[in-house]
Regions:
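Non-heme di-metal
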Residues: 1-169
């Protein structure tokens, strides 16, 4: 059982990292929700709703670690939105492809943030948490890069005879 530390006694950069990460996860969740609300395509809306929920779960995981480590929940003012990196918000005229590119960049930034956080923290529990979040964010990057590739490749590789139901009776 990890001994609870006082927030004031914590000398490590971990506290600041977790507070910033919490703010960023909330911001990402809100961005995906906003994008979803603006889309008409149901499959695209669902994808962004799922991403919004995933980012919310990342926030909840961070918050749980914070509560278990310090024995209290962070106050809103403790979440350092002022030092959080600005997420590029797509312009109103952005198409789906533009939005996917922004998301890839955002998720890559999250990977880098958590990789750096894992290197900087001296807290083993936090290090494990950050390494887990790197894997989750990396999965998001892969998912959207694959989708972008499928959208932008001029042709997918398959033979005409592989297409089902392309026959006459």
């Amino acid at each position: 059982l990890q001994k609870k530390k006082s927030v004031e006694e914590k000398e490590d950069v971990t506290l600041s990292i977790v507070e910033t990460a919490m703010a960023e996860e909330l911001k990402a969740s809100a961005l995906y929700k906003r994008i979803s609300e603006q889309l008409e395509d149901k499959a695209a809306k669902l994808k962004f709703d799922v991403m919004s929920n995933a980012e919310q779960k990342h926030y909840e995981r961070l918050r749980k670690w914070y509560e278990e480590s310090f024995g209290k929940i962070p106050e809103d003012k403790k979440i350092k939105t002022s030092k959080a990196v600005k997420i590029e918000t797509p312009v109103k005229s952005a198409n789906y492809e533009d939005v996917i590119k922004i998301i890839i960049g955002t998720e890559e930034n999250a990977c880098k943030f958590y990789e750096d956080a894992a290197k900087k923290t001296e807290d083993e529990g936090a290090k494990k948490l950050f390494e887990t979040l790197v894997k989750m964010e990396r999965a998001h990057v892969t998912q959207f890069k694959d989708e972008f590739r499928v959208m932008t490749e001029p042709s997918l590789l398959f033979a005409e005879e592989e297409i089902p139901w392309m026959l006459e009776v």
